[in-house]
């Protein structure tokens, strides 16, 4: 079915691009490496363009709840290991192309029954989210910026031909699940209930195509603080021998297929004494992400000495992190009045090395849902360690500490803010 479409597209391109080619000087066509002329990209993929149908509304009024008859004992908070303890229940919603979204169900946590030919197993039709529920001092349950997670999950699903959904309805259903399993939310500061919404293609077929059926489910896991005894700065290996994402790819979507290929490079970095990879891209060695987090660096401008908080732009090669956006918003609100410049632009590993050599490197940290922020001590690059500004006795810079405190204040309801969603 695809070949006739591609043939027609090629024919259209030939007719449409002929006038463009005719206007390009011959020298530009030959000397692309030295000419300033570049061909214009004719097409690009956007989330909405990838949707085969309009979002089909979920119906929360059809929710059924079946509670477990064998509730699990609660673990002591200090015994919690990330992602290894799960609550009593899960939310699941089936979809098929004929009926759309079926009635949502909250049931006891259980195994899935899938055909071995399900498309998720063969062609990676899978996307997910990571978000958390918290208890404030009054025992009220709160979610942190869940609308951003719903938006991103829809974008990820659309990019791999999975169905979209009404984000407000799914958020309401997730809140219902959280309330059913509220006893699993630890009350101590730094603890939370990690939520994992996941969507998979379930159609029984070995053919490569958009799945005709899918499953959206949500599981929950009580977790402790990423740094239980306080910050512990990490060391990174600048990685250019493997690529996490590339222009026109899916590095900005939260797909499982983006994560598995990163494990071997991480193991290699760990074998050399580094905790994470700092992913570089291209001959210029642009800094993109750190491990599974967005990357921030604080530098002094070489010409003016002004303080700058710098992070890579949303160019399609990095994830649209919810914590990243929160850090940027807080920085513009609280740091900009103090003279900081908050900048989203491409920057290179050479820039960071030069800043360190010249004493202009203030600090660096990663940002993500699991840790909020993760301070960076040093980066291994081209056989040398690039110092990221921390003193020997320090495990965190001033900015990373402030960001963690500012974000936690809104997560736990100490500061009433629109980012906090009460269940």
Regions found by a protein language model. Name each.
Residues 1-53:
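N-terminal mitochondrial targeting presequence
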Residues 36, 40, 168, 176-187:
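An exposure/low-complexity boundary signal
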Residues 3-5, 9, 44-177, 205-423:
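Helix-start/capping segments and mature chain N-termini
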Residues 180-183, 188-213, 224:
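Non-catalytic, conformational "gating/processing" segments within enzyme and secreted inhibitor domains
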């Amino acid at each position: 079915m695809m070949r006739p479409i591609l043939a027609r597209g090629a024919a259209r391109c030939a007719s449409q691009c002929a006038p463009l080619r005719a206007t390009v000087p011959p020298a530009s066509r030959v000397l692309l490496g030295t000419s300033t002329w570049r061909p214009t990209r004719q097409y690009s993929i956007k989330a909405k363009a990838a949707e085969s149908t309009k979002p089909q509304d979920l119906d929360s009024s059809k929710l059924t709840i079946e509670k477990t008859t064998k509730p699990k004992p609660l673990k002591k908070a200090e015994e919690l290991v990330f992602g290894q303890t799960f609550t009593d229940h899960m939310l699941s919603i089936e979809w098929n192309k004929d009926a759309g979204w079926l009635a949502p169900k909250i049931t006891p946590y259980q195994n899935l029954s899938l055909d071995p030919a399900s498309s998720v197993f063969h062609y990676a039709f899978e996307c997910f989210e990571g978000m958390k529920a918290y208890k404030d001092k009054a025992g009220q349950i709160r979610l942190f910026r869940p609308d951003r997670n719903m938006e991103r999950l829809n974008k990820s699903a659309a990019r791999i031909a999975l169905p979209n959904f009404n984000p407000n309805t799914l958020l309401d259903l997730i809140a219902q699940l959280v309330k059913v399993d509220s006893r699993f939310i630890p009350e101590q500061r730094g603890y939370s209930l990690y939520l994992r919404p996941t969507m998979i293609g379930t159609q029984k077929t070995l053919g490569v195509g958009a799945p005709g059926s899918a499953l959206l489910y949500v599981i929950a896991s009580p977790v402790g603080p990423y740094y239980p005894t306080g910050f512990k700065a990490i060391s990174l290996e600048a990685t250019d021998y493997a690529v996490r994402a590339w222009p026109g790819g899916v590095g900005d979507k939260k797909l499982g297929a983006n994560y598995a290929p990163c494990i071997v490079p991480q193991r290699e970095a760990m074998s050399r004494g580094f905790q994470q990879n700092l992913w570089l891209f291209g001959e210029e060695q642009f800094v993109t992400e750190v491990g599974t987090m967005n990357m921030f660096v604080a530098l002094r401008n070489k010409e003016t000495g002004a303080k700058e908080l710098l992070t890579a732009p949303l160019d399609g090669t990095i994830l649209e992190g919810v914590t990243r956006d929160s850090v940027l918003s807080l920085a513009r609100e609280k740091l900009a009045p103090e003279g900081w410049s908050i900048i989203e632009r491409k920057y290179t590993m050479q820039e960071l090395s030069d800043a360190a050599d010249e004493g202009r490197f203030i600090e660096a940290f990663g940002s993500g849902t699991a840790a909020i922020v993760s301070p960076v001590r040093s980066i291994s690059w081209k056989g040398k360690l690039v110092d990221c500004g921390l003193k020997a006795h320090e495990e965190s810079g001033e900015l990373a500490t402030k960001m963690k405190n500012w974000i936690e204040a809104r997560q736990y309801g100490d500061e009433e803010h629109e980012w906090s969603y009460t269940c």
